[in-house]
Amino acid sequence: MQITEALISEPGDIRRFIQQAVDHWPHLLAFYFTLHSAEGNINGQQIHAFCTSFYRQVHERITERNHTASPSSPVVLRWLREQHRGATIRCLLLFSQELFCHPRASVTVDEECSQVVDLLQQSWQVISAGGQCRVEKRFQVARGDTSGQYVALKTVALSLGLPVVTAIIYRPVQRCTLITAQ
């Protein structure tokens, strides 16, 4: 798994990060949520462990589904979160809707989104005993949509306290070497 992080403090950079996600995925799902710690300030190690744990759970779930149903694209998660180290941190998680809601699956978007919320909450409970992960809003944005959900998503992203940390988490493609007998 590879994590690429950047600290950004300009509203234009935040808009660009959101636009890149919308441009990358034809159907984007985003979750705006708040992490609360009952143990005091949330530190960088806890956030890293949370993101890693969530990614692993998603990857395992998708790998399992790929064996029983239609394959999905590689797991890529984009995160946007406040940098400050308080007991509460607001976050955005962005990913392809097809990652969870495969067009040929019989499960609805609402059912799959409910499972995403459960995974977020379970991941945070492991990291912060007694803490809470409260999902505030879900966004569904189609590529080319410049109103409604897209505007609401950008507004929420821009409401995060500056500077913010962006992260992209993915598993690099493993290259295979073909060896031929001489």
Description of each model-found segment:
Residues M1, A38-N41, Q83-A87, G130:
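Generic structural signal for short, solvent-exposed loop/turn connectors between secondary structure elements
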Residues M1-W25, Q97-Q182:
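Catalytic "initiation/cleavage/transfer" segments centered on a nucleophilic residue
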Residues L7, N43-I47, S96:
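Alpha-helix initiation/capping motif
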Residues I18-R81:
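Signature for HUH/AEP ssDNA processing cores
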Residues Y32, T88, C133-V135:
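A structural signal for short, well-ordered beta-strand segments and their strand-loop junctions
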Residues Q45-H48, L92-L93, R104-S106:
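Surface-exposed beta-strand edges and their flanking turn/coil or helix-capping segments
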Residues V75-C101:
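Histidine-centered divalent-metal-coordination microenvironment in nucleic-acid enzymes
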